[in-house]
Amino acid sequence: VTPPSPGEPQRRVTAHLVTGSTVLGGRVLFGQDPAEVVRDLGGLSPNTSLRAVDVLTELVEAPDGTPLHIDRVVFAEAGTRAAWPSAAAGSGLSPSPTELAAGEDLPQDRPRLRRFASYGIVDGPDGRVLLSRIAEGFPGAGTWHLPGGGVDAGEDVRAALRREVAEETGQDGQVGDLLTVSSHHRGQPGGHEIYAVWVFFHVFVASPRPARVLEENGSTADSGWFTPEEVAGLRLSATAQRGLAYMARHSRP
């Protein structure tokens, strides 16, 4: 896994299952699906439906002085009531920073890239959806993508999304509910192995402006507002397909 730059915190991801007033937790290792980690923690069947409850950003130091950036992803069984966030009050969540201080012992056979990314299903008062187009030279070049991207070391997951929306589209969005959590893991023989955890939030832009890219020499070539009918005719990135498919399944008729 690519090591952090000098002075940057070590990155960790944990997954948690809220059952009533109890919170179970486990470390998410490279390549693991957070939802599968949670099902294993709770002794649930592989087909058990889960709902994403929350994502927490924790910036701490381990007892040995190691700075840690922990992204904690919280789930509950679909259709159940969960005492969140009161279930997390008082004692800290497990695994603790002490338990997370050690790095992973991964094979050294290839470069590995790990990413925790936050994306928005962004809309405005008229129901149009905000998308950004990936620039040439980046994975998925030319496809339309959800505004968002990697969470920087030391950055809160929601603050990162609001920043990305502003940089990629010129909009001031309010980050709302967590919608779903997904993971992506792929590798090529002799090439990099890439692993990412994607979290998707609803973002509302109360006062939409014409979309324009503010970042320079970045991964975004263009951005724009689209009706749902127009979105159906666009070539979408894998991330956008996954996030918009979730919305299509869960939107009210």
Predicted regions and their residues:
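A generic structural signal for short hydrophobic patches within well-formed alpha-helices
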Residues: 231-232
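Acidic, metal-coordinating catalytic segment for phosphate/diphosphate chemistry
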Residues: 1-9, 58-121
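Short, well-ordered beta-strand micro-motif
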Residues: 74-76, 122, 200-204, 224-227
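The catalytic Nudix box helix
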Residues: 27-51, 146-179
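Phosphate/ribose-recognition catalytic cores of enzymes acting on nucleotide-derived substrates
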Residues: 194-209
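N-terminal strand-loop-strand
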Residues: 1-29, 104-144, 173, 177
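A generic structural micro-feature
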Residues: 64-70, 110-114, 143, 191-197, ...
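Ordered, small/hydrophobic-rich secondary-structure cores
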Residues: 1-67
